[in-house]
Amino acid sequence: MINKKIIWITGASTGIGKDLAIKFAKSGWHVAASARRENLLLDLNKINQNISSFPLDVTNTENCKEVVNKIINRFGAIDICVFCTGMHDPNSEKRFNLSKIREIMEVNFFGVMNSVNCIYDHFCEKKNGKIAIVSSVAGYRGLPAAGGYCASKSALTSFTESLY
């Protein structure tokens, strides 16, 4: 269908995900950019015509499956996934807000696991595909006022290493 490579990047609205989306788009890739904040994705679309936005809540399995299907329907396949999903709320750590820490775990760890699970069948079917998972140095050592974030990135690092 289309001979350009297709990369799906989650967490593409800010930070590393946004930077990667722009760099891949400038290199000629079709970038399927996903994040929760649709307004930031729309801003990203304006930067380069090779970037298409696919709003996504990584914690919602049905939404994740829908996004994978939309990307495949639009481009024919997904060649590479880069999962940069992440959130942090330093204020929740200071007050030890368990519900916020659970949300951090849900997004940073389970959300990435969910994304891997949603793309897995597609990669098996086409017998090809690569996954890159962006974690953090916080996955290897504790940081002040960041216990929930560090725990989520540590779990993500261990999960990623188990995929080899």
Please report, for each region that a protein language model flagged, where it lies by residue.
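Conserved glycine-rich cofactor-binding loop
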Residues: 13-14
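Conserved glycine-rich Rossmann-like NAD(P)H-binding loop of the short-chain dehydrogenase/reductase
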Residues: 27-43
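The beta1-alpha1 cofactor-binding region of Rossmann-like NAD(H)/NADP(H)-dependent oxidoreductases
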Residues: 56-66, 98
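Substrate-binding pocket helix/loop in short-chain dehydrogenase/reductase
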Residues: 92-93, 97-105
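Active-site loop immediately N-terminal to the catalytic Tyr-X3-Lys motif
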Residues: 94, 141-147
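Active-site helix of classical SDR
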Residues: 116, 152
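Residue(s) in the substrate-gating loop at a strand-loop-helix junction
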Residues: 136
